[in-house]
């Protein structure tokens, strides 16, 4: 896993107060969670968008939204995936959730819910976005699939600076 290798090997170049995104004590759990995260959520949109049959679409659709329900439940009592400590898993998940909410959901047909309709996931996204490093590197401009060459910006989707507490 390239990201884990970089997190470990380049740790010495990070600021002293930067969180360790792949701490030794959580590595097994992070790896297990990421092994679940990729096929069910990170790749969920692509499984729906590029399927070759209605059967495959329906299976990917149900799996993606069932997985979001599980994730929303997990975040009911946790600020981050592993409690109060931010990890590699949070970074991987955040990127997908922001992309889904600002763009991807438009490409897969009718959807059960938007990210904004999962209260714990939505609070989690807003909480992460309120952290300076996430805000600095979250870019809301993307090419829309229905208007080639035209870019739209949607920072207001997540930029609400309402404090989020667990």
Q: What are these regions, as identified by a protein language model?
A:
Residues 1-166:
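C-terminal alpha-helical interaction module
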């Amino acid at each position: 896993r390239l990201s884990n290798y970089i997190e470990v090997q380049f740790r010495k170049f990070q600021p002293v107060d930067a969180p360790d995104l792949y701490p030794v004590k959580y590595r097994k759990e992070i790896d297990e969670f990421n092994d679940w995260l990729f096929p069910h959520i990170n790749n969920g949109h692509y499984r729906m968008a590029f399927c070759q049959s209605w059967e495959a679409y329906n299976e990917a659709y149900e799996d993606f939204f069932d997985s979001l329900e599980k994730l929303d439940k997990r975040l009911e009592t946790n600020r981050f995936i592993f409690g109060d400590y931010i990890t590699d898993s949070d970074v991987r998940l955040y990127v997908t959730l922001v992309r889904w909410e600002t763009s991807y959901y438009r490409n897969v047909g009718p959807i059960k819910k938007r990210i904004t309709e999962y209260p714990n996931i939505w609070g989690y996204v807003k909480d992460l976005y309120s952290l300076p490093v996430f805000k600095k590197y979250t870019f809301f401009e993307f090419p829309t699939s229905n208007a080639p060459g035209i870019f739209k910006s949607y920072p207001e989707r997540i930029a609400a600076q309402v404090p989020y507490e667990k």
